[in-house]
């Protein structure tokens, strides 16, 4: 491979006073330059054309640059490439996805191109690598299917003790081969002895992203609650709760549909056929510098038929109202908890249809108990859902924010703006209202439990 001259601009210098080799080099550079005077020839090419050695050409170019005849111009990395295979190493170091995208778009002329990214964890959760990690997780858990993506993440599990030597093998599958166990053990011990080194060890040797906040709900447990056989027909005529999180008109809006049943004295929850809406422009008119990744998710879900696109730049709430009315025909709606943000008009419309809207402010008071109840129901197997991929994505994006000094009071937040939690928030509100309707003691229940007493 020839050594690249990384870019020089010929300033139209005069040849007077230069050595013959320098004049010849300038002439060759001029031949290679474009209209702006920019050229990208290899040193090997210049040397061959003027009949000089490569070391002579390098020395002459360095002298011409030092004397001001040439100025260095940065070249955009990867431009002009058409690779069969591109390998991006330590992707977490990339501030943007510019190089990755350049390589990917250059593969259009290849029949079986391969884009391969290799990396440890890093510190920039706003960067392209962390976003790619989320994309891989979404593919693996099935919320955003992608047959063109293969990904594998070696890291420790939630709740693992990072100081335990046993966890090293989880994050280092080649332990004892390309990295020695003794080395990892020594680094682990150093991190245990020096708090300043702990984050470095976790990031580089356990693939734990620094600054990344843990998801509140366990997605493995959530997926074990999945029951794709659940249909609305199974709950026809049974009261349900419709909960709405409307977000912004430019963003995704959601409706959760929740049923409850008493089984062996315990409340079981059923999330069936949730609905999601997003405006057309948010899905298909995203500029290159905007949130392309979210738009790609939305497009995939539209193709799957689980996301409804409304015309224009804003969600038309009339679509949502019609869906709520249709839901009421299948199952009588007992209540419609709704986020008050921007929802005044829809709330009035729901009231006109006797769908009993209840305004729920998303604060610690209203969200903590139902959020913890939903977690408990998921872990105990009392929660059942139909596997809607958008709801799964939203659940996986929920991070628990607690009151300082009190980890027992919590509310749902998202780690980043693109990590939508609308469906999860609607579901939590529905669980909160269902908790108020849990079976109460009637006179018959009391007599059955305690018998008749004489006063």
Swiss-Prot record:
Drop me one GO molecular function for this one.
endonuclease activity
Q: Which InterPro entries match?
A: TerL_ATPase, TerL_nuclease, Terminase_largesu-like, WH-like_DNA-bd_sf, WH_DNA-bd_sf
Q: Which Pfam families match?
A: HTH_36, TerL_ATPase, TerL_nuclease
Domain of life, source organism: Bacteria
Membership in a protein family? Belongs to the phage terminase family.
Extra information? Encoded by the e14 prophage.
Listed name of the protein? Protein YmfN
């Amino acid at each position: 491979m020839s050594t690249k001259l990384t870019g020089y601009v010929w300033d139209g210098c005069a040849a007077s006073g230069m050595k013959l080799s320098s004049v010849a080099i300038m002439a060759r550079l001029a031949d290679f330059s474009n209209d702006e005077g920019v050229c990208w020839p290899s040193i090997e090419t210049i040397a061959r054309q003027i009949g000089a050695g490569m070391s002579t050409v390098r020395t002459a170019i360095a002298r011409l640059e030092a004397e001001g005849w040439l100025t260095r111009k940065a070249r955009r990395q990867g431009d002009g490439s058409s690779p069969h295979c591109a390998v991006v190493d330590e992707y977490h170091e990339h501030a943007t996805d510019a190089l990755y995208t350049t390589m990917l778009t250059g593969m259009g002329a290849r029949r079986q191109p391969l884009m391969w990214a290799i990396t440890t964890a890093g510190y920039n959760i706003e960067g392209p690598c962390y976003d790619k990690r989320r994309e891989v997780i979404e593919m693996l858990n099935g919320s955003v299917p992608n047959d063109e993506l293969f990904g594998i993440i070696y890291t420790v599990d939630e709740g693992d003790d990072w100081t335990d030597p046993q966890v090293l093998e989880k994050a280092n599958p080649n332990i004892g081969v390309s990295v020695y166990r003794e080395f990892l053990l020594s680094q682990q011990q150093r991190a245990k002895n020096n708090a300043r080194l702990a984050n470095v060890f976790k990031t580089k040797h356990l693939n734990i992203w620094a600054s990344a906040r843990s998801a509140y709900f366990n997605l493995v447990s959530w997926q074990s609650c999945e029951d794709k056989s659940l249909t609305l027909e199974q709950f026809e005529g049974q009261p349900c709760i419709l909960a709405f999180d409307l977000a912004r008109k430019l963003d995704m809006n959601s409706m959760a549909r929740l049923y409850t049943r008493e089984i062996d004295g315990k409340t079981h929850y059923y999330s069936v056929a949730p609905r999601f809406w997003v405006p057309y422009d948010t899905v298909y008119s995203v500029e290159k510098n905007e949130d392309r990744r979210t738009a790609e998710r939305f497009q995939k879900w539209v193709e799957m038929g689980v996301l409804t696109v409304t015309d224009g730049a804003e969600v038309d709430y009339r679509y949502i109202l019609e869906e709520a009315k249709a839901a009421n025909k299948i199952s009588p709606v007992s209540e419609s908890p709704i986020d008050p943000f921007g929802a005044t008009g829809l709330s009035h419309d729901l009231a006109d249809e006797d769908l009993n809207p209840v305004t729920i402010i998303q604060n610690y008071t209203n969200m903590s108990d139902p959020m913890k109840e939903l977690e408990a129901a998921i872990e105990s197997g009392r929660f059942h859902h139909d596997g809607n991929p958008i709801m799964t994505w939203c659940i996986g994006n929920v991070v628990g924010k607690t009151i300082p000094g009190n980890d027992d009071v919590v509310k749902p937040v998202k780690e980043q703006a693109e990590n939508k939690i609308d469906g999860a928030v609607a579901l939590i509100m529905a669980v909160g209202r269902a908790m108020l309707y849990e079976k109460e003691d009637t006179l018959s229940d009391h007599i059955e439990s305690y018998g008749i007493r004489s006063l």
